[in-house]
Amino acid sequence: MSVKAQVLAALDGAQGRYLSGQELAEGLGVSRTAVWKAISALRADGYPIDAVTNRGYALRRGTDVLNAGAVRALLEPGPAAALQIEVVDRLPGTNAALRARAAQGAPEGLVLIAQAQSAGRGRSGRPFFSPPGSGLYMSILLRPELGARQAVRITAMAAVSAARAAERLCGAEIGIKWVNDLMRDGRKVCGILTEASMDLESGMLDHAVLGLGFNLTEPAGGWPEELEGIAGALFEDFPAPGSRAALAAGVLNEFWPLYRAGSRDGYLEEYRRRQLLTGHTVEVLRPGTPSRTARVLGVDRDCRLVVQFEPGSTPVALGSGEVRVRPTDSSAHKSPTALTE
């Protein structure tokens, strides 16, 4: 655990009581300079730490502190309770870190949570804005018995799990924009990225890394210009203390039983019901071919998007790895529409 994380844990455990720099340094076995640097870094991340001469430092009561213990304490008895939880301050990307560990033989069920990412990625390698103090970024290592074409099921069950957990926490309706975006009031509040490594001989997945990035609040200074009008937040005001741990645990409590069960029955109909694109016209973008417009009919049993390019033409199922879709009308972002088979 870093000095920064140890200082945060000590201040959180003090429950608002002041701890002197000397007390912190001796308790952690570090220098007072290291403590001061950790305090400065925590303040830069948005933690409200008060300093009083001759008394020391205190973390304001009610601060939303995220650590592995807080997440573990909220895991329900059952399959999810055995998950291995790690929380870090910052990484280039949680997916990249877990993929490296998967290649070294790390076990299924390892969960890596970061409070910020310096090089977060979304689909097609696009940057994923991951600032400190306003989001939650987590990845889960899986070793599923699935073929490559079935990997989209992981994203679908994760989307349903994340939507359930987010709705419980923020109280607002959450929709899913195929294949991997959670939306609140027309704005993206969560992105999901599943990356997999395949065994070429068997055609089955060797492992998959499921990543989820949530916007809990609008970041300090607002959204970057390129995300204005696109990105949104789960909470209009700062969430209650413990919300990040509750969200992480909520996702795991929902996702892990679905994943272990391996059945579509637990999530497919809800994934369809929460879809925002059904009944709307979209622009279909396939690599190397001109874009085409199509009407979305629904989602099939393999979580592919079923579209019709011309009235009366044969419906076509689109896989997430071969296309991107872009709604042609803004109402497709706003509320779930009942879907057809």
Give residue ranges: language-model regions.
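Long, positively charged amphipathic alpha-helical accessory segments at protein N-termini or as interdomain linkers
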Residues: 1-31, 40, 44, 146-152, ...
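N-terminal lobe of the biotin/lipoate ligase/transferase fold
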Residues: 2-168, 188-190, 242, 337-341
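Short loop/edge segments at beta-strand edges and connector loops
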Residues: 89, 176-178
